């Protein structure tokens, strides 16, 4: 779906993400800018090579510069590891705040992972409540130093 429409998160995982944004954070998805670290899908949906991520980095930086978000949410392993400049597993990064280019950033599981592991939905809901609290004015506890 994402490839044919050229828009991230429009398939089943995207529909789940929309419900979570609107029901937990309580803002319309239309007020959330969603982009991918990698700007195209690797062949056969394989994991991206570091060189592929490096090629896309300037585009991501420009997107973030233009949008100037209050908070960034890193969905999944590759986004979290890239934004936090670490190879720490997503299970250890999930639910933790850091800063990317001075912007408060939180890592959580990717919605596609939740489609395969529904038992993890509760922890992601907890992460989204942390995001809501920060958007409502709470100070995040920065735990990941990047």
Label the predicted regions.
Residues 1-146:
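A polyanion-binding, active-site-adjacent surface
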């Amino acid at each position: 779906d994402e490839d044919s429409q050229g828009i991230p998160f429009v398939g089943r995982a995207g529909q789940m993400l929309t419900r979570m944004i609107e029901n937990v954070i309580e803002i319309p998805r239309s007020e959330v800018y969603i982009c991918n670290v990698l700007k195209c899908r690797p062949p056969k949906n394989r994991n991206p090579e570091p060189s592929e991520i490096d090629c896309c980095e300037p585009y991501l930086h420009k997107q973030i510069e233009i949008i100037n978000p209050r908070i960034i949410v890193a969905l999944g392993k590759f986004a979290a590891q890239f934004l936090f400049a670490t190879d720490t597993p997503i299970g250890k990064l999930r639910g933790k705040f850091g800063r990317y280019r001075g912007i408060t950033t939180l890592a959580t599981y990717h919605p596609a992972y939740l489609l395969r592991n529904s038992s993890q939905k509760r922890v992601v809901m907890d992460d989204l409540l942390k995001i809501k609290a920060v958007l409502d004015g709470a100070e995040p506890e920065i735990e990941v130093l990047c």
